[in-house]
Amino acid sequence: MKRAGGGVDFISSLPDEILHHILANTPTKLAIRTSVLSKRWKHVWYETPSISIVCNRVDPDSLNKTLSSYSTPKIKSFDVTISRDVTVPEIDTWINLALSRKAENVSLRFTSHYRFRDTFFINSSLKQLSLTLVYCILNPKCVVSWSSLRNLSLNRCKVSDDSIAKILTGCSLLESLTLNLCDRLNDLDLSKSLSLRRLEILGDRWTPERIVAPHIRYLRLENYQRPSTLVDVSSLTEANLGLSKHVLDYFTCEMETESLQYMVRQTVVKLQNIKKLTIGGIFLQILSLAELCGVTLPVFQNSISKL
């Protein structure tokens, strides 16, 4: 294979391992197209350790037929975005592919109604999992066993207190947890997650009312309607707090305003001894108003910065 103008095609002369690395950073749809370049490229993508699928205009049947040729025994990264209606068996096929090839990093984004099979919750290969489930309820009926999982990100998931507790019980090595716009959570108890060091909660009116997280070192907490009550964050060293400007729309009368000031004060009381605290403008505005109203605020021993 030569380039136009008679030059040598150095890329095709590279070892398979390097070509696999190149294709691993390419959407699977484009990686598959390289198979028509020459005989040298015909089977290269079959053993690429990463799959990235965006299913919006792609025909699922055609995609499944193509993926049936995928032969690598081990997947490092599996990323699927489904922004169109597909059938449950089609989703099952893609997830089973990831599970059967022992994928380590899995990212799934669904806008279809779907219920995960029990086999999804029993996996010793997963190290990083990100789920964006617009219409799905995450409610495992079996015992969860994600024994190698270290990073978990749940986005737009409907997950109850009992369900998150069951999930976390099966993640003994979990170090980082992100909850983004997840509803149905009231009490988030992370006291049994001994390895958890990082917690990020980005929410709206459905953010947890109470947070028990005695082992975390870093907390990012951005709420919409109200601050969460920090029951135990005794190991915390750094926090990032923010409130949406819309929070002021929900606290209009004098009694509600005083309640908001009290909740914000109680939050910062829990954080007065941490090494680094970053607060957003609305949060700072409420603190300043509370001080003007005679509310006693804690004295911070370390650095505070504003977003």
From Swiss-Prot:
Residues 8-54 form the F-box domain. Coiled coil: none annotated. One of its GO terms (cellular component) is peroxisome. It comes from the Eukaryota. InterPro entries: F-box-like_dom_sf, F-box_AtFBL13-like, F-box_dom, F-box_plant, LRR_At1g61320_AtMIF1, LRR_dom_sf. Pfam families: F-box, LRR_At1g61320_AtMIF1. This is F-box protein At5g03100. It comes from Arabidopsis thaliana.
